[in-house]
UniProtKB/Swiss-Prot annotation:
Chain segments annotated as transmembrane: none
Highest taxon in the source lineage: Eukaryota
Cofactor: FAD
UniProt note on tissues of expression: Widely expressed.
Pfam family, any one: NAD_binding_8
Annotated signal peptide: 1-27
Stated name of the protein: Prenylcysteine oxidase 1
Natural source organism: Homo sapiens (Human)
The entry's keywords: FAD, Flavoprotein, Glycoprotein, Lysosome, Oxidoreductase, Signal
One of the record's GO cellular component terms: very-low-density lipoprotein particle
GO BP field: prenylated protein catabolic process; prenylcysteine catabolic process
Organism classification: Eukaryota, Metazoa, Chordata, Craniata, Vertebrata
Enzyme category, top tier: oxidoreductase
Length: 505
């Protein structure tokens, strides 16, 4: 009798294990990976996506990466007399863990962001000037603004603390189907509320004074996003975090991360411009009709096309920037009308006319960077000494005592304006570009899932545009594409992740 019972228990146990291996997610067989994936845009978002898609789908999938200009996208550099300088995104926060990982994995080197003293100019005078002495800076800030600088630091730290949860979620492979759901998983209704309120409104409600907001907050928004405190509060917090210490950059230029990720992902770069994308039915080698995406692109004057199982769009869907048409989708893919901010970067090698900002002699000026307030009638957002991408230390003056200065402005500077800023100069180069979204809360972020297997990364820029935000969006899109391909619905848009993962420690 005992033997019969033992055999029955053994049989039931075997049956249970068999059922579990068939039904439990851990034991479920993965669907065969896609044959081909297309990524449109080879900036930090597109190349990060290629890197993470390769990790998830394995070595056999073919990844084509389309770029009509240079790898690196908006992480562009400008040349001044044979030296390269960052045109835009130049510093990285010490808590930007994706960027830190990329630099480590790719064998690149990090350099500390250049230091130097900073001043704030209101159109008439310097309302604040940094000192070389920390205690003097503290006294100046407390004397003029009370303890508002400390309160501001605490507010930004609270936002960053919640934001850091994304790294734990992504390390456990969780993904989100919309920007709003991602932000809600990090900071709940508070983060969503920040998208729908201006930074000015948020900080006024928190009790910050008009003087502090005008003199200390608005200039940071102007240098980082070319806009005022009317931007949304979330991107405002991201911008203010760039005032922290420990900022760094990639030696040789931040765009090296993009070329490194492209190479590490073993993706195929296609130097062409994508014209349109259309869903079509195609018979694959299995003999079964399959829904695929035809990507039609142009190289020079030649038009070509290819079919893909999955497509990721990693360039802003703005007519002035990508001009991609989505053909015959049902329902139609919505038009995107996100306006991007026009900004002009000007690099000038010359001797600054310090009398614009101060009556002190030029050798006593001492400031490396000057930011401007919103009510300044000066025609620039900011001006500062910049190192080349190869310099590891703060830049030294050339033999004639001149530096290379980077100027951000809303409009292209005229020669007369440059001559007003500089006593003399021997080189100037300008780059007008659409750098980041024009923020006007309340913000409605574009969908991440445009169609069944068609994804959009740059919608995250409506929350905040930054290198790390693009890398986060890329990792999320790669995870989302992977889980939806394999039917892992339990890994998408999960509620209570923070508490769930906290209990697993």
């Amino acid at each position: 009798m005992g033997r019969v019972v033992a055999e029955l228990v053994s049989s039931l146990l075997g049956l249970w294990l068999l059922l579990c291996s068939c039904g439990c997610p851990e034991g479920a067989e993965l669907r065969a990976p896609p044959d081909k994936i297309a990524i449109i845009g080879a900036g930090i978002g597109g190349t990060s996506a290629a890197y993470y898609l390769r990790q998830k789908f394995g070595k056999d999938v073919k990844i084509d990466l389309f770029e009509r200009e240079e790898v690196g996208g908006r992480l562009a550099t400008m040349m001044v007399q044979g030296q390269e300088y960052e045109a835009g995104g130049s510093v990285i926060h010490p808590l930007n863990l994706h960027m830190k990982r990329f630099v480590k994995d790719l064998g690149l080197s990090a350099v500390q962001a250049s230091g130097g003293l900073l001043g704030i100019y209101n159109g008439e005078t310097l309302v604040f000037e940094e000192s070389n002495w920390f205690i003097i800076n503290v006294i100046k800030l407390v004397w003029r603004y009370g303890f508002q600088s400390l309160r501001m630091h605490m507010w930004v730290e609270d936002v960053l603390d919640k934001f850091m949860r994304i790294y734990r979620y992504q390390s456990h492979d969780y993904a989100f189907s919309s920007v709003e759901k991602l932000l809600h998983a990090l900071g709940g209704d508070d983060f969503l509320g920040m998208l729908n309120r201006t930074l000015l409104e948020t900080l006024q409600k928190a009790g910050f004074s008009e003087k502090f907001l005008n003199e200390m907050i608005a200039p940071v928004m102007r240098v980082n996003y070319g806009q005022s405190t009317d931007i949304n509060a979330f991107v405002g917090a991201v911008s203010l975090s760039c005032s922290d210490s420990g900022l760094w950059a990639v030696e040789g230029g931040n765009k090296l991360v993009c070329s490194g990720l492209l190479q590490a992902s073993k993706s195929n770069l296609i130097s062409g411009s994508v014209m349109y994308i259309e869903e079509k039915t195609k018979t694959k080698y299995t003999g079964n009709p399959t829904k695929m995406y035809e990507v039609v692109y142009q190289i020079g004057t030649e038009t070509r096309s290819d079919f893909y199982d999955i497509v990721l769009v990693a360039t802003p869907l703005n007519r002035k920037m990508s001009n991609i048409t989505f053909l015959n989708f049902d329902p139609p893919i919505e038009e995107f009308h996100q306006y991007y901010q026009h900004i002009v970067t000007t690099l000038v090698k010359g001797e600054l006319n310090t009398s614009i900002f101060s009556s002190r002699p030029i050798d006593k000026f001492g400031l490396n960077t000057v930011l401007t307030t919103d009510n300044s009638d000066l025609f620039i957002n900011s001006i500062g000494i910049v190192p080349s991408v190869r310099e590891k230390e703060d830049p030294e003056p050339s033999t004639d005592g001149t530096y290379v200065w980077k100027i951000f402005s809303q409009e292209t500077l005229t020669k007369a304006q440059i001559l007003k800023l500089f006593l003399s100069y021997d080189y100037a180069v300008k780059k007008p570009w659409l750098a980041y979204p024009h923020y006007k809360p309340p913000e409605k972020c574009p969908s991440i899932i445009l169609h069944d297997r068609l994804y959009y990364l740059n919608g995250i820029e409506c929350a905040a545009s930054a290198m790390e935000m693009s890398a986060i969006a890329a990792h999320n899109a790669a995870l989302l594409a992977y889980h939806r391909w394999n039917g892992h619905t339990d890994m998408i848009d999960q509620d209570g992740l923070y508490e769930k993962l906290k209990t697993e420690l």
